[in-house]
Amino acid sequence: MNIFKLATMLLLCVVISCSTTLSAQGISPEMLNSIQKSYQSNPSNKALQNAIAGSDINKIALSHENEANYDTYFSNRVPSQAVTDQKSSGRCWLFTGLNVLRSKAIAKYDLPADFQFSQVYLFFWDQLEKSNLFLQAIIDTRKQPMDDKTVEWLFKNPISDGGQFTGVANLVDKYGLVPADAMTETNSSNKTSTMASILSLKLREFGLELREMGAKKGTTDAQLQQRKAEMLQVVYKILALNFGEPPAEFTWTQRDKSGKPVETAKYTPASFRDKYANVDFSTYYMIMNDPGKEYYKVYEIEYDRHVYDGDNWKYLNLPMEEIAPLAIASIKDSTMMYFSCDVGKFLNKDKGWLDVNNYDYASLFGTEFGMNKTQRVQTFASGSSHAMTLCAVDLDENDQPKKWMVENSWGSSYGYKGFLIMTNEWFNEYMFRVVVESKYIPEKYLKMFENKPVMLPPWDPMFSPEE
């Protein structure tokens, strides 16, 4: 047998072997027949099929037995204010951060319960700063190829209306605050999707232009910065047309909780912040539970910030049983906290109740859903999706938490009068972040923040903007 024939036969064997392997890996008629028989052999499946076809899955899976555990009493609760409404926007992080600040202002100055800081005011600056963050990041990475993972991530995520607490802190420090009636909501701030799409499209176009400009021989950094400034003029115009221009000065009348006028004065955003929200954000620490990473270490997420020269999200990773006492200490001292979780899991929308036993999917579908918290995060099945204000805890006779309550920003008609109640078991499984003031944190944890953080990439499974 000559070499050519031998090579041909070997090649044919490889092809046949690969074909056989691929066939075995696909769904064969025999396999499909076996799958179908396993379903059809159980008579109850037909009844379930008919029931699910005409109803919502959650209505069928709802555990009526578990509803007896629903309870709205709380042993420790921070006095609540009028519930806010972020409407059809992803600004939960902003509403939550400002709710923490307004709670302090209302208590200090005896303001009406419906007092609010303007969310759209800070959102205007947020979108301008995020646009600059994206454009400057494109300049910084201009020498990297287009398929570089960081460059790819930037173009996939040029801007969003989501965010987190360090964004609130940086924006308030830089731009101040105004009351809600000094800059009111618009259709575009309440429904952000259209403007977000337009702005994202323009930023991607600008990003490509900056990369092309930076690739040309002789282009200086000063030229890139000048062009970026011109691009931000366009961004500013888009924002101003959608939201209006932020006020540089305004007159506002302070009223007491009964609505009686107390004082009328002129303010700038900075002077209004200094009077009504004079807080030191450096005393606010981010605590997180990410069981897939080593505990008692500080982590930082690259590009997880709102302002280019601001702060990335930086947190101390702790076990859940060590986070709860920090939150309890804060609530006992009438201090609300920025809190975020995976809000959609096992949520009874009608009651505003979060309980891992709300829905019995295992009995309905005849299979267990057995991933733990670590596995859910690793496989992108769970993560921090929504920020709210942690305001209450119900403790048992041993001072251990039974359930928690958060003030939401979906309006007062959602859930329990605008609040959500969560069992401690749900809290442990789906709570991820809480921001605690230093006076409620033991010194041993504060010292851990002095260590150099472990830098994580922005595409880490744990991190996405809270909406």
Per-range role (PLM):
Residues 69-321, 325-337, 414-416, 424, ...:
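Active-site nucleophile-adjacent alpha helix/oxyanion-hole segment immediately C-terminal to the catalytic cysteine
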Residues 3, 342-344, 393:
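Histidine- and/or cysteine-centered catalytic micro-motif in compact active-site loops
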Residues 1-26:
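Bacterial Sec-dependent N-terminal signal peptides
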Residues 92, 172, 378, 383-411:
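Catalytic nucleophile-His microenvironment captured as a short glycine-rich beta-strand/loop
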Residues 310-385:
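Long, positively charged binding patches that form subdomain-scale interaction surfaces
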Residues 396-467:
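Conserved catalytic-core surface of thiol
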Residues 95, 339-342, 391:
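Short His-Asn-centered micro-motif
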Residues 26-82:
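N-terminal regions that are enriched for targeting/export leaders
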